[in-house]
Design a protein with these regions (language model features):
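Hydrophobic helical h-region of N-terminal Sec-dependent signal peptides
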Residues: 10-19
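N-terminal signal peptide c-region/cleavage motif recognized by signal peptidases
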Residues: 21-23
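Catalytic-site microenvironment of enzymes
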Residues: 4-5, 12-13, 26-204
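Basic/polar, cationic surfaces and motifs that engage anionic cell-wall
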Residues: 1
Length: 204
């Protein structure tokens, strides 16, 4: 989401505020999560100035992760840990992320460390993770750790064959799926169309 906000965040703030007003009236529910918080002070500040109904997902390895956790909490935003996870591609992920082959103890330790950096988090979603969320062993270890930390999991659905939701339910972890990416395109009109698609989905 950060790429889009660099060019269009002011317009998005107005648009999203109007959407939330409409949704309150219609008694429908739309959850919006803005990812990649913790790297860019200006963009982060613009996101945190948005209505409190918008959730923020903080990357624990980001340089401003701790202060963004405090600021988001002070402004009554729900907070998620945006946990880096191994993708199918060879893109390198941030330090402390989840990769294939980690032991259960290693996964547990990384989740605990992430929670210590973002202590006000109520859940976790995946940053990338197309390989990680399709791996049953890694997801089993992750859901065990999330259950111990009393965190839910939001599957960003970066791959169609994700097993995260299935394993979360088996492990007794609350799980949600991402349905629509708002910023597949950086064009404001495209993002607005995605918002409208999100509204229609929520009203089903």
């Amino acid at each position: 989401m950060a790429r889009f906000f660099q060019s269009a965040v002011k317009n998005t703030i107005i648009f999203s505020t109007a959407l939330f007003s409409a949704f309150t009236f219609a008694q429908s529910k739309l959850a919006i999560v803005i990812d990649d918080i913790g790297y860019h002070p200006k963009e982060d500040a613009e996101v945190l100035a948005m209505p409190k109904e918008i959730s923020v997902a903080i990357i624990p390895a980001a340089p401003y992760a701790k202060i963004r956790n405090q600021q988001a909490k002070a402004q009554n935003h729900d907070i998620l840990i945006h946990m880096p996870m191994q993708p199918v591609s060879n893109i390198k992920i941030e330090e402390g992320g989840l990769t294939l082959g980690l032991s259960e103890a290693q996964v547990n330790e990384r989740v605990k460390k992430a929670k210590s950096i973002v202590p006000n988090a109520i859940g976790m979603n995946n940053h990338m993770g197309s390989a990680a969320t399709a791996d049953a062993t890694l997801m089993t270890y992750l859901m065990t750790a999330l259950r111990e930390q009393h965190l839910f999991f939001l599957d960003s659905r970066t791959i169609g064959k994700s097993v995260a939701g299935k394993i979360a339910k088996e492990q007794g972890v609350r799980v949600l799926d991402r349905h629509i990416f708002l910023d597949d395109s950086d064009n404001l009109a495209d993002v607005q169309r995605q918002f409208q698609s999100a509204i229609q989905y929520a009203r089903k």
